[in-house]
UniProtKB/Swiss-Prot annotation:
The keyword Zinc-finger does not apply. The record marks C109, C143 as: Involved in the association of subunits. The modification Phosphoserine is found at S15, S430, S514, S747, S748. It catalyses: [(1->4)-alpha-D-glucosyl](n) + phosphate = [(1->4)-alpha-D-glucosyl](n-1) + alpha-D-glucose 1-phosphate. The record marks Y156 as: May be involved in allosteric control. It comes from Macaca fascicularis (Crab-eating macaque). Homodimer. Homotetramer; to form the enzymatically active phosphorylase A. This is Glycogen phosphorylase, muscle form. Belongs to the glycogen phosphorylase family.
């Protein structure tokens, strides 16, 4: 029998380190050991750092699975209305740290790995990003999944398990080069294959009309096999599911050829079926009408709807029948949210199932479909709107085309009855667009087939009602809503900026993590010298850490005391990275003109990927790197100005750069950025914003107060007026000497001496066909940047403004966004109730 502990020995257990929970740490170490040996079949003599990462991932995952099973059992028992979020993109990033944060395991895992002689941060860096998205739309879906779990909604994310996610960007000779993102090379410890739920998806074939109704026959079948990933809520023991579909060829695929000796070819041709989820299309805000992309869109929709209906039929429903056969209650038990038009085929597919397979009459089926579906619009750029050629649909999905024609006919009959004699309105509102190539307008299909249509920021939702969807708003104003986007504070504050989260928690407690409006309490600390000092200190630490990262990974040296001026987002003309470039060159010219004058030192960092086929976006990257080559090697400039292109911008890099930012660039032409979410991440992490009155910037400035925001440039009305008058870049070129100098430098090869005409396409675009009016905002932008520099010279005032921004960023939590979707679109009530943990009695 061991001797009892002395009082002093007992007291030694009271320590900060002890907070991890000693039995927890011991248990984690034991499980880590078990997974290393029994799951990975390695010992310490041959284990690599990657093996240690996998062992840790499996150890953490063990804490998810009990909660995951318990959550699904809870949903089966309670049979709540289920929310299905359909998206072609889920830009999840890394999972390990997020899971530890949401399960309150971070301290214990840190201690356990430390005791095992490992560095948890190094292990976290080994994980590949799940890059199954291009940018904002896919990342929004990921934030929404986190919030739906945190709010206790019975929600499921449905998408595609792409074998290759968004390409890895390499910069070579100043140009973007794309490399395949082989994110599954070493396996994915977070997913669970579910081959037992494999479902058939049909393509091609033709339609037979019988006395029983329409039959789609002689189709090619591809099997959809689901992979499930757990999505934990924040410390509430809820774990929801993201189900991503992969493709398999059926066993008899093309084997009729076998009899004539084509066995080998038939087996090789299985690849054609399995190509569907091979790669994410890397276009952001651009529609490319490729057959494979249409196959992807139908593939996810067809598999998901079968799954939804299977779950609906087999759920508890207070009746003795083995399955539910009555679809009257379907819209009361199922909500389908379409993330943009990419999953729009859900509307005709649900109609096909109800009418052709469930033998429901058209009007009833249509009522069920409309009450079930809702559509989120993400862009007003005409080149981004999906318009599928009829000939493609006719070949690939002949029955769906017939259903779309029928939907259109009935819809136009309603329009004609409401607006008699208005023929042009019928043409404008038709789902079918006539022209050289007949097309189906998928946004029109979504509006007709949904009970709710929403934009993603107040100004964007207003633009939808006044411009591109004006006719539809006049027909059915009750359908149109706004749901301003948000971000999850778990990943975008607690995980990426623990120093700031801690400083905040010391003042107002930890409840803000799942109730971000509580940040308002920080307004009473705006004049608190200790708090001002703490916030500034955390920012400086983050800047030093990021500077060290750049030095380590890219051998790039930057001045950590300079103003970190950051623009990170997809490279696109409408986001106006070119305006940023013009400012950088202007600043450079000013330093060269007055080398002895004091300039606030700046490090301008720009990052983002260009679509591989987008010539102008790739030229913009080449320009940024060329400016950097000149500026960074000019001894006159020294440490006062640096230009860095951040290679391969992705979720895991944004988690490093955003907490280090001083200035956030949100400078799209007013009326073009639907919302933006990067803007919110910077605001929450203590950067100030320079931006136009566009997207969510408008609401951010409203929350913080315009005096705490660097607003510049034309408003939407000004852009409209300029369009009416006719935008003439030459006017600005002639009138503004500094602008003229910059353009002359670009034209003359100042930044490309070996190839003087390298940037002629950029100059030509800016001078003659710039849809996004860069010159019109140049002067105001430069003046606004001068105000930024002036304030940065006063660190106390700068930090006070930062605190006001952080304190008013609560509105931009995705928890608020999702609570609004739940109440106003899905008809469900969010719940903060904690489920019992797996080791607790129910």
């Amino acid at each position: 029998m061991s001797r009892p502990l002395s009082d002093q020995e007992k007291r030694k257990q009271i320590s900060v380190r002890g907070l991890a929970g000693v039995e927890n740490v011991t248990e984690l170490k034991k499980n880590f050991n078990r997974h290393l040996h029994f799951t990975l079949v390695k010992d310490r003599n041959v284990a690599t750092p990657r093996d240690y990462y996998f062992a840790l991932a499996h150890t953490v995952r063990d804490h998810l699975v009990g909660r995951w099973i318990r959550t699904q059992q809870h949903y089966y028992e309670k049979d709540p209305k289920r929310i299905y979020y359909l998206s072609l993109e889920f830009y999840m990033g890394r999972t390990l740290q997020n899971t530890m944060v949401n399960l309150a395991l971070e301290n214990a895992c840190d201690e356990a790995t430390y005791q095992l002689g490992l560095d948890m941060e190094e292990l976290e860096e080994i994980e590949e990003d799940a890059g199954l998205g291009n940018g904002g739309l896919g990342r929004l879906a990921a934030c929404f999944l986190d919030s739906m779990a945190t709010l206790g909604l019975a929600a499921y994310g449905y998408g595609i398990r792409y074998e290759f996610g968004i390409f890895n960007q390499k910069i070579s000779g100043g140009w973007q080069m794309e490399e395949a993102d082989v994110w599954l090379r070493y396996g994915n410890p977070w997913e669970k294959a579910r081959p037992e739920f494999t479902l058939p998806v049909h393509f091609y074939g033709h339609v037979e009309h019988t006395s029983q109704g329409a039959k789609w026959v002689d189709t090619q079948v591809v099997l959809a096999m689901p992979y499930d990933t757990p999505v934990p809520g924040y410390r509430n023991n809820v774990v929801n599911t993201m189900r991503l579909w992969s493709a398999k060829a059926p066993n008899d695929f093309n084997l009729k050829d076998f009899n004539v000796g084509g066995y080998i070819q038939a087996v090789l041709d299985r690849n054609l079926a399995e190509n569907i989820p091979r790669v994410l299309y890397p276009n952001d805000n651009f529609f490319e009408g490729k057959e494979l992309r249409l196959k992807q869109e139908y593939f996810v929709v067809a598999a998901t709807l079968q799954d939804i209906i299977r779950r609906f039929k087999s759920s508890k429903f207070g009746c003795r029948d083995p399955v539910r056969t009555n679809f009257d209650a379907f819209p009361d038990k199922v909500a389908i949210q379409l993330n943009d038009t990419h999953p729009s085929l859900a509307i005709p597919e649900l109609m096909r199932i109800l009418v052709d397979l469930e033998r429901m009459d058209w009007d009833k089926a249509w009522d069920v479909t409309v009450r079930t579906c809702a559509y989120t619009n993400h862009t007003v750029l005409p080149e981004a709107l999906e318009r599928w050629p009829v000939h493609l649909l006719e070949t690939l999905l002949p029955r769906h085309l017939q259903i779309i024609y029928e939907i259109n006919q009935r819809f136009l009959n309603r329009v004609a009855a409401t607006f008699p004699g208005d023929v042009d309105r019928l043409r404008r509102m038709s789902l079918v667009e006539e022209g050289a190539v007949k097309r189906i307008n998928m946004a029109h299909l979504c509006i007709a087939g949904s009970h709710a249509v929403n934009g993603v920021a107040r100004i964007h939702s207003e633009i939808l009602k006044k411009t591109i969807f004006k006719d539809f708003y006049e027909l059915e104003p009750h359908k149109f809503q706004n749901k301003t986007n948000g971000i999850t504070p778990r990943r975008w504050l607690v995980l990426c900026n623990p120093g700031l989260a801690e400083v905040i928690a010391e003042r107002i407690g930890e409840d803000f993590i799942s109730d971000l409006d509580q940040l308002r309490k920080l307004l009473s600390f705006v004049d608190d010298e200790a708090f001002i000092r703490d916030v500034a200190k955390v920012k400086q630490e983050n800047k030093l850490k990021f500077a060290a990262y750049l030095e380590r990974e890219y051998k790039v040296h930057i001045n950590p005391n300079s103003l970190f001026d950051i623009q990170v987002k997809r490279i696109h003309e409408y986001k106006r990275q070119l305006l940023n470039c013009l400012h950088v060159i202007t600043l450079y010219n000013r330093i060269k003109r007055e080398p002895n004058k004091f300039f606030v030192p700046r490090t301008v960092m720009i990052g983002g990927k260009a679509a591989p086929g987008h010539h102008m976006a790739k030229m913009i990257i080449r320009l940024i790197t060329a400016i950097g080559d000149v500026v960074n090697h000019d001894p006159t400039v020294g440490d006062r100005l640096r230009v860095i292109f951040l290679e391969n911008y992705r979720v895991s890099l944004s988690e490093k750069v955003i907490p280090a930012a001083d200035l956030s660039e949100q400078i799209s032409t007013a009326g073009t950025e639907a919302s933006g979410t990067g803007n919110m991440k910077f605001m929450l992490n203590g950067a100030l914003t320079i931006g136009t009155m566009d997207g969510a910037n408008v609401e951010m400035a409203e929350e913080a107060g315009e005096e705490n925001f660097f607003i510049f440039g034309m408003r939407v009305e000004d852009v409209d007026k300029l369009d009416q008058r006719g935008y003439n870049a030459q006017e600005y070129y002639d009138r503004i000497p500094e602008l003229r100098q910059v353009i002359e430098q670009l034209s003359s090869g100042f930044f490309s001496p070996k190839q003087p005409d390298l940037f002629k396409d950029i100059v030509n675009m800016l001078m003659h066909h710039d849809r996004f009016k860069v010159f019109a905002d140049y002067e105001d932008y430069i003046k606004c940047q001068e105000k930024v520099s002036a304030l940065y010279k006063n660190p106390r005032e700068w930090t006070r403004m930062v605190i006001r921004n952080i304190a008013t960023s609560g509105k931009f939590s995705s928890d608020r966004t999702i609570a609004q979707y739940a109440r106003e679109i899905w008809g469900v009530e969010p719940s903060r109730q904690r489920l019992p943990a797996p080791d607790e009695a129910i």
